[in-house]
């Protein structure tokens, strides 16, 4: 068969043969096979052209995708899959991109961890979860995480939380909230305990008593609809104690209002 026409169509070229076959190819494909109008090609050559064109097109797509930010193997695979490329072609593209160091899951993890150390507040468990969602192997993640000291990150996150909640919660409630928030961010309980033990959490006593009075007033309005006398006092005490207020402060206030 003969190539009847090669016509540029935006980023691709339309190749038509005199037997009715047609396909889109990249410029790299034309150069690789030295294709030209009137050139004789066999069915086997046409199949090779199709395979190379898919590979070249897919690789260009992948490089475009990677140009915006670093990507993992899985991210590139999923992106190419959306463009209806064959699995065998996608695997070849990824293998070549790995060989050329365009894709490197190890470096991706290291970059992710560096960014978290500089600007982030995530603990190892949350980081592991996020990286596994990106298709990175557990072995790569565990090795990289084991080399990071997460104490400074947890401490920085803790100080930020203290600054945010210090004037809104009593000391015990602040400590409890701090513990829960840090665990939710993926830090281990032992590390959170160590951070809490080394931080000096100071709360203004006058402010704490003001918060206690406001909370007591709120709880009293609610509980007085169902309880009275000793039962009301007990329920109110329990409600305030659960909120993290000091038992002596609660008893003192209850003596004034009940």
Curated annotation (Swiss-Prot):
Gene Ontology CC: cytoplasm
Pfam families assigned: RecX_HTH1, RecX_HTH2, RecX_HTH3
Record keywords, A-Z: Cytoplasm
InterPro entries assigned: RecX_HTH_1st (IPR053926), RecX_HTH_2nd (IPR053924), RecX_HTH_3rd (IPR053925), Regulatory_RecX (IPR003783), WH-like_DNA-bd_sf (IPR036388)
Main localization of the protein described in the UniProt heading: cytoplasm
Top-level taxon: Bacteria
GO biological process, one term: regulation of DNA repair
Subcellular locations according to the entry: Cytoplasm
Function, as annotated: Modulates RecA activity.
Annotated family: Belongs to the RecX family.
Protein name: Regulatory protein RecX
Organism lineage string: Bacteria, Bacillati, Bacillota, Bacilli, Lactobacillales
């Amino acid at each position: 068969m003969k190539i009847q026409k090669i016509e540029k169509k935006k980023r691709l070229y339309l190749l038509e043969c005199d037997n009715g076959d047609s396909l889109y190819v990249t410029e790299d494909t034309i150069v690789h096979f030295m294709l030209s109008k009137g050139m004789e090609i066999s069915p086997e050559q046409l199949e090779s052209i199709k395979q190379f064109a898919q590979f070249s097109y897919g690789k260009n797509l992948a490089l475009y995708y990677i140009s915006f930010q670093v990507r993992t193997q899985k991210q590139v695979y999923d992106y190419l899959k959306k463009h209806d490329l064959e699995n065998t072609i996608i695997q070849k593209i990824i293998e070549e991109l790995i060989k050329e160091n365009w894709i490197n899951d190890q470096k991706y993890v290291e970059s992710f961890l560096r960014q978290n150390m500089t600007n982030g507040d995530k603990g190892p468990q949350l980081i592991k979860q996020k990286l596994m969602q990106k298709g990175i192997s557990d072995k790569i993640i565990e090795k990289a995480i084991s080399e990071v000291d997460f104490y400074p990150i947890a401490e920085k996150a803790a100080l930020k939380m203290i600054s945010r909640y210090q004037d809104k919660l009593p000391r015990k409630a602040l400590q409890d909230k701090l513990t829960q928030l840090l665990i939710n961010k993926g830090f281990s309980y032992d590390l959170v305990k160590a951070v809490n033990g080394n931080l000096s959490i100071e709360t203004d006593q006058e402010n704490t008593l003001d918060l206690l009075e406001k909370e007591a007033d709120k709880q009293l309005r609610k509980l007085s609809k169902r309880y009275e006398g000793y039962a009301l006092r007990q329920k109110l005490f329990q409600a305030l104690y659960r909120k993290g207020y000091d038992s002596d402060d609660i008893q003192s206030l209850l003596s004034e209002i009940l």
